[in-house]
A protein has these predicted regions:
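Active-site neighborhoods and metal-handling regions in enzymes and metal-associated proteins
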Residues: 1-397
Length: 397
């Protein structure tokens, strides 16, 4: 279904002087169309290196020109079944299945030209001489160069700022998916914690988390499992999941990111396994207080940079310095999205934004351990809705 207000998209694009957005990254295509070919990633090779997976969405500033989608020919059945809101559907290439080729035994079939199909759509819609916004960060030069060759009179600009501006404000359907994702994510986290046993490795618990995602109807995006302190120096980063064995007196940190219908729950907790030291207990209390204090500032009208400054001021008397360069961040189809609660992001919080809070400290005793509690919130008209409240913030659960 359509996950944004077209009038708002028009306003954003016209303010930036954009006539049409050409989205090519997986997350932007999926956002604008609510469609992505399930088995495919951005670089999936179909039958040779000239035929890699590519799906494109064109979003004209004027809705009467009609949005369009360009997909590989072998996706036609999938598109019909998934039936996204975009009805102008075009296909490139002969498709993956040889029974559809002119000569099924051709050893060198034409791979097709996705940019030619895209350019033809733009010409038909009277946009060939307009300002075309492409995802410069993600669209390779081979593709972008081909599109510019086919449309020599067009002006090409970057689409990234316009797409992010559109994605920051969530629609009712996105919010519904977030609520379900966070409900599932909270349960998956708690069930994973209750599955922890002495002698387990981080990889063992990671496998439990993956399994629980499937059992609870969520997709596994990623999760960090960290046991510690474990004698590690984390001055420039946290350890990847590995073979540290869980012992009594350790913390378990799970930073989980399951998703539901494309939308992510970003939830992190630190819990004690067995009785932890007094200093670890105190660090947990401080971290919990930091999150709860920052929650008081999450409301429409607050600048992201103001919330970050308030967080930084809290460190003056707690005995720990800040660890990460922001207080929290936006979430959507990607776990880290604008706006960031950072000193250089002056975005004003608005209703229907989804943000996290994750002030983080580093406890050093027997090795470094990042102490992090992360929660996800919906900005409402008068405050916040705590989407991950079902996951206890307690030291022991």
């Amino acid at each position: 279904m359509q996950l944004f207000e077209y009038d708002r998209a028009t306003h954003i694009m016209e303010a930036a002087g954009i006539d049409v957005i050409i989205a090519t990254s997986q997350k932007s295509v999926a956002y604008l169309s609510d469609y992505w070919h399930p088995p495919s990633d951005q670089f999936y090779v179909l039958w040779d290196t000239e035929a890699t997976h590519m799906t494109i969405v064109g979003l004209p500033a004027q809705c009467e020109r009609d949005a369009f989608i360009v997909a590989g020919a072998s996706e036609s059945t999938t598109l019909e079944i998934m039936d996204p809101w975009i009805q102008d559907r075009r296909y490139w290439g002969p498709g993956y299945y040889i029974q559809t080729w002119d000569n099924p035994l051709d050893p060198n079939p034409p791979s097709g030209d996705v940019m030619e199909v895209t350019a033809n759509a733009l010409k038909e819609k009277g946009l060939a001489n307009g300002t075309i916004a492409i995802e410069m960060r993600y669209l390779g030069s081979k593709y972008s160069g081909r599109l510019q060759e086919l449309l020599p009179n067009a002006t090409f600009v970057d689409a990234e700022d316009a797409i992010w501006a559109l994605r920051m404000i969530k629609c009712d359907e996105e919010i519904r998916r977030f609520r379900i994702a966070c409900e599932k994510g909270s349960k998956i986290w708690l069930d994973t914690i209750h599955s922890a046993e002495e002698g387990m490795t981080q990889s063992d618990l990671q496998a439990v988390y993956r399994r629980l995602c499937i059992e609870n109807g969520a997709e596994y995006e990623r999760a960090y499992m960290i046991f510690g302190p474990a004698g590690l120096d984390l001055s420039n980063g946290s350890p990847a999941s590995g073979e540290v064995e869980l012992e009594k007196g350790m913390f378990i940190r799970i930073d989980g990111q399951p998703k539901y219908q494309g939308y992510i729950c970003n939830l992190s907790r630190i819990v004690g396994f067995g009785e932890v030291s007094d200093s670890l207990t105190k660090a947990h209390e401080i971290e919990k207080w930091l999150v709860e204090r920052c929650m008081e500032e999450m409301k429409p009208g607050m600048k992201c940079s103001e919330i970050r400054q308030i967080e930084l001021d809290l460190y003056d008397d707690i005995g720990y310095p800040p660890v990460i360069p922001y207080t929290g961040h936006g979430v959507g189809r990607v776990v880290h999205e604008p706006p960031y609660l950072s000193l250089n992001d002056h975005t004003v919080l608005q209703p229907n934004m989804v943000e996290t809070l994750e002030p983080t400290i580093c406890h050093s005793e027997g090795g470094d351990m990042f102490i992090s509690i992360e929660d996800q919130f919906l900005i409402t008209n008068d405050g916040i809705e705590w989407l991950t409240e079902a996951a206890p913030m307690d030291l022991y659960v």
